[in-house]
């Protein structure tokens, strides 16, 4: 009989968001008339920018004409999109990133997991706690961890607690770790990192030969000019960091699927024989073998983000969600809850009232207010006693959800 990858059996009972979906579905089935408002999973609600829609319609027409039809595209992405990304998102901020170092993909979630294909099995790995579950679960699937303990922590991972006491920015570890996952603006806490904090991480990584896996999926929500948008704004980062970005939240591409990963050509890691190997070459080989590229139509839509109209429309989208976050922050703070995040990020991180557990607060809100959020404990042991509320919804739903919650605390 064929055998399985036993590492999957080490995963906790259910990925966080499917478990939320299961509980919400059970509640909805028992209460079919309940007006449920979902502020849990970070999915957008507003339509794609008109500039993107128009570009995609034109691209569809291209596919209907023999002269402009496109078949397989470059696995790395079309040059016209990569050039615009390099110029606007990186070079305009003083980052030394070339278009040839950018790989277009169908999601940063995929890339965060797939990047492990080019790293060895013996690397030590550090994640913050709480943390986006994908970083942990993909390492479990790849066999990089031992079993899970009662607190949900996996043997073999180095957990770096982030909490109100350290302003939700992890302390540099005293021991050497090889791969370091950082996410700023942070999911789930909404925290941001100063330039000096990121410089400390880069200095650590360079001194230990470590690689930083930097998730910048929410960088477009940064409004503070002192906060870096990219790890490559930090001196030395090209020698120790890979960056992931996405069009999902800034341009509403959660259902359209387009993202990017930057792998500098100067970035090296060790082979078993102690020789230095360019990670760019490995990632390029991996993508060329396992990925056929993002749809031409979708890439044209992403390119339109960088047009004058696209920039104005995406800015309006971001401002809309940030205003939602402001409403959530202000209403819950006024109701007496301790609230974090939601300023340079679309997530608000709330301390649960009266010391109740994260899942108990989830059930309380669902049953009393018909509002869905995300239990902090689902992001790690240090998330217990916290709750994430997403700003991704309509203004009317956000205002109604806050009315219900504040009336039932």
Swiss-Prot record:
Residues at which pyridoxal 5'-phosphate binds: 72, 108-109, 132, 187, 218, 246-248, 257, 292
Pathway stated in the Swiss-Prot or TrEMBL entry: Amino-acid biosynthesis; L-lysine biosynthesis via DAP pathway; LL-2,6-diaminopimelate from (S)-tetrahydrodipicolinate (aminotransferase route): step 1/1
UniProt-listed GO biological process terms: lysine biosynthetic process via diaminopimelate, diaminopimelate-aminotransferase pathway
Catalytic activity, reaction form: (2S,6S)-2,6-diaminopimelate + 2-oxoglutarate = (S)-2,3,4,5-tetrahydrodipicolinate + L-glutamate + H2O + H(+)
EC number(s) recorded for this UniProt protein: 2.6.1.83
This protein's UniProt keywords: Aminotransferase, Pyridoxal phosphate, Transferase
Needed co-factor(s): pyridoxal 5'-phosphate
Enzyme kind, highest EC tier: transferase
Single Gene Ontology MF annotation: pyridoxal phosphate binding
Residues found modified as N6-(pyridoxal phosphate)lysine: 249
Binding site for substrate: 15, 42, 109, 132, 187, 292, 388
Pfam families per record: Aminotran_1_2
Role noted for this protein: Involved in the synthesis of meso-diaminopimelate (m-DAP or DL-DAP), required for both lysine and peptidoglycan biosynthesis. Catalyzes the direct conversion of tetrahydrodipicolinate to LL-diaminopimelate.
Family: Belongs to the class-I pyridoxal-phosphate-dependent aminotransferase family. LL-diaminopimelate aminotransferase subfamily.
NCBIfam families named among the record's database cross-references: DAPAT_plant (TIGR03542)
PANTHER family, sorted: AMINOTRANSFERASE
Subunit structure as annotated in this protein's UniProt entry: Homodimer.
Name the UniProt record assigns to this protein: LL-diaminopimelate aminotransferase
